Amino acid sequence: SIMAESVKAAESVVFNRCTEEMELGSFKRSMKALNPNIDIIFEDVSGNIISGTNDTVPYDMEADVIEVSDNDFGVWFIDCRDRPKAYDGRVVRFKAQALRDPELKENEFVASRQVMTCCEDDIALVGYIVKKTDVITDPSYPAEKEWVMITAKITYEERDEYNGMGPVLVAETIETTEKPKMEIV
């Protein structure tokens, strides 16, 4: 769509005439899904900048293992990238499709999902690098496009794939699983 292409190319976006009833966190996540580096500004009806947004997440951040449901992958993906201090060292469990990238090391793959921010034309593949540990000895597992349930410790590393710092998930367990009812989030 025209709007999605504009957001992908923009450095900043301003939402004006915002009210307390609006889900500003949802707007922010939608924009960040299209353009991770975009600066977002919210203004109230008087034109004053609103500092902070309600960034509550739909999963328990206090749990020993953060359980990300199939529908909440997109929220987690963006929040994990945007708030490294909240996630660094935490353990997460989620379902994703394994993608093999020849640029990655043999013990690495990408845990990915397709996300749609606006309409079918805007579907994009997103994911984070997963490092397999000594517990997972088969170099070919998981196979390309195999659906897996991953439990991993979240770390942050400087990586070329991210053009800087980004989440790298150190796998504790990887289990083959059924694909989700809705493959696109």
Regions found by a protein language model. Give the residues of each.
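OB-fold and OB-like single-stranded nucleic-acid-recognition modules
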Residues: 3, 7-185
